[in-house]
Each structure stands twice: as C-alpha cells, then as structure tokens.
Design a protein with these regions (language model features):
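Sec-dependent N-terminal signal peptides of Gram-positive bacterial secreted proteins and lipoproteins
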Residues: 1-9
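Extracytoplasmic
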Residues: 13-398
C-alpha cells in the first residue's frame, strides 16, 4: 500500500476529490509460523523438528488465556558469564546479546494458561537489518517458528525532500533512531499474523533467547494474557469524553512525511496517475517530473511493517480518520492495515481495515459495522497515528 496523505476529519464523510491520498500495493508473504509452549507434544530441542504453530494452537485450543502476568528483568540471568549486563540508555537492568549470544532466565508462571510475550528492547548500531532471534521454553522449541523471530527497528528521514535543478524531487536518505521499543511477538512470516502464545503450567520455567542476526539489548520480557481489542461500542463507553464531535476543518497529513517507519526501504515515492495527488512542495501533480508525493507501494507489503505520523489536534473531541489511497495490484482483493492511536488499536473497527482494489485513487474513512464513519476521541495536543501491514481476515482463509 502506498499513500500520500492521512486526513483527520470532522465526524463526517470524505470528499474523494479533496486531494488527500494513500495507495495500497501488496504482495502475499512467504509461508512461516510461530508461538510457544512448555508442554506441547511437538516440542523439540531442534526448531526444524518441532510442530507448526498452527498445530500447536490446535493442541492448546481449549486452554485458557492468562489473567495474570510475570515480568522478567533482563539482568536476572541464570548465568551471565560472557554477557554485558547492566545500565543501557537510562535503564539499569539490561543485557546485550550479540550475534550467537544466548541468555536464559528462570521465572515463575502464576497460573496454567496461554501467555503472549512482549519484549522491551533497544536497537543497537549495526547493519540496520531486522533483529532475528530464537526462543526456547524449558530447553525446547515449542513449535518451529520459535526458531525464526524478528523485531523491527525505527527509521526517520535524514533531511527533507529536495528539488533538483530539473524540477525532479529526491527522496531523503534514511537514518536509524536508536531507542527503547516495545513489541509483542507476532507471526509476521506466515499467512496467520497471529500473536505468538506459549502454554505454561503453573510453576518454575526457563526461557532462553538466542540472537541469530544483529545485536539487541533486552530490558524486560513480559508474559501476559492476549490483548483483547474492544468493540467500537465498548471503546466509546470507556472514554471519559468532555467534548462532542469535532466540526472544524480537516487536519491533513502528507503521507510521504512519516514521523518514523519500521524499514529503511519506506521512502517517499511518486504518483503520476492522479493530477490532484499533492506533494509537500507542490499542490499540483506533474506528468513530466518526479514528485515525491506518496508513501508505500510494494515496499510496504510485509506484515509487521509500519508507518507512524504525528498529528497536532486543535481541540478535544471525536474524530474520524480518512485515507486517500491507491490499491491497484491485488485484483479483486483487499489488503489490510491496522491503525494504532498512541500505541493502541482503539477498537475492532481499526483492526484489519480493508483497502479494496481500484484502478484509480479512492478515499476511505474508517467505517463501523453499519458502514458509517467510526470515531476516536482525541484530546488537544500531539498524538501518534500508526498504520501497520496485516493480513487481517485473510489470515483465517489462508
């Protein structure tokens, strides 16, 4: 998917000719799977010999989700010999894993249940690739995908979109941001897009992480129940709203001006299909010149890739989110995106949003179940809006 702008709208419909744009081009990812357990019959000391995550889930389909959580401090190792343990970027309980390093922790599971795993980690200057690792429960891989996991980095534009002497625009170089990040382990390599879960019996267990590509600093690993995204009705009921629907002018965000992105390949692109596709340096498109007026296309197609934007909201109120987009590659199909607001998917309406095939540019306001625009409550000030590639409902089919 590629696009040129977000628009944070008054709680109303979007005009297809408003010049806000977004485009969706997507390829089907390679097959893979993942999740974890300490008691699965398919567990193995070799990831290649372990069962698939699909079979693992089937094996534990009647086991309950955890209602309690346990946090492992990364410096609380069984054996810290040869590892760098201590303070890193204002956090004092961390461990650095270089390539091929392993770390093992002992922890107590408070209940017999299925647990998700969330890493609090820091990127380290290296080759700029995704950080890959494996994990084992009690010395075994619970399923094959536990042998192939990855965590994303964060990138920003190193400068602005430049205009050359011939009028063509040049995309800026990408610069990595080294910072603390949080990610729940998900299956971004297969057809499922599932959150990886592990089955743990109540009691003591060990958890081993081995870095296989790129170094990584770990702060904490949290085992917890799978997050439940509320329905739109539940979300609205949970908001302590002090204002009504926003009725001002739309807040337009150029899609090519992402605040951060998950991959260095996500650079401003160009569109020559629509004359009204605006850019940061021009309100009109050009058939003759390269104007960096979109973001995405084929470089934004793999589950887990994301783009984030900062929006400055003028007043408290209820807002809808619209995207002008082009999705002209997956004929007869839709591609899907999750939308996060300040780090969370607000409601199920913002999960797995369909961007359907169209040979021309189209506009979409995130819809509710009845087709009318769904809404989010924003307070005055800055907020983060993030779009993430997901297979959405297609994962159930695949």
């Amino acid at each position: 998917m590629a696009f040129t702008t977000y628009a944070i709208y008054p709680f109303a419909d979007v005009d297809d000719n408003a010049g806000t744009a977004s485009a969706v081009n997507e390829t089907v990812p390679d097959t893979e799977t993942a999740a974890g357990s300490d008691a699965g019959t398919g567990s193995s000391a070799n990831a290649d010999d372990a069962i698939s995550y699909y079979n693992y889930k089937q094996e534990h389909q009647n086991d309950k989700d955890a209602t309690k959580q346990v946090v492992i401090n990364a410096d609380n190792l069984i054996d810290a010999q040869g590892l760098q343990v201590g303070e890193y970027d204002a956090e004092d309980k961390t461990v650095l894993l270089n390539e091929d390093d392993s770390a093992t922790w002992s922890f107590y599971a408070p209940e017999t249940a299925m647990y998700a795993m969330t890493f609090y980690y820091h990127t380290v200057e290296s080759k700029g690739r995704d950080m890959e690792f494996t994990f084992m429960i009690d010395g075994e891989f619970p399923y094959d995908s536990a042998g192939n996991l990855s965590l994303k980095r964060a990138w920003v534009d190193d400068g602005e979109i430049a205009v050359g002497a011939n009028g063509n625009e040049t995309a800026p170089y990408q610069k990595e941001v080294y910072k603390w990040m949080t990610a729940t382990l998900k299956d971004n390599e297969s057809y499922s897009s599932d959150t990886f879960l592990v089955y743990l019996t109540q009691g003591e267990h060990t958890y081993t992480v081995t870095s296989t590509r790129e170094p990584i600093v770990i702060g904490t690993i949290t085992f917890h129940g799978q997050e439940t995204i509320p329905t739109q009705q539940e979300y609205v009921a949970s908001v302590n709203a002090t204002a009504g629907d926003y009725s001002g002018e739309p807040i337009v965000i150029q899609g090519e001006l992402a605040t951060e992105k998950s991959d260095s390949s996500l650079i401003p692109s160009y569109d020559r299909i629509s004359p009204i596709t605006q850019g940061v340096n021009s309100l009109e498109n050009s058939a003759a010149k390269i104007l960096r007026n979109t973001m995405g296309k084929n470089s934004w197609s793999h589950p887990g890739q994301w783009l984030s934007y900062t929006v400055d909201v003028p007043e408290d109120g209820w807002y809808s989110i619209g995207v002008r987009y082009l999705q002209n590659t997956q004929t007869g199909m839709a591609v899907c995106r999750n939308i996060y607001v300040d780090g969370k998917i607000p409601s199920q309406d913002f999960e797995g949003i369909d961007f359907r095939y169209d040979a021309s540019w189209a506009s979409l306001v995130v819809p509710g179940e009845d087709g009318t625009p769904s809404k989010i409550y924003l307070t005055k000030g800055q907020h983060e809006i993030k779009m993430e590639v997901t297979l959405g409902k297609w994962s159930d089919i695949m």
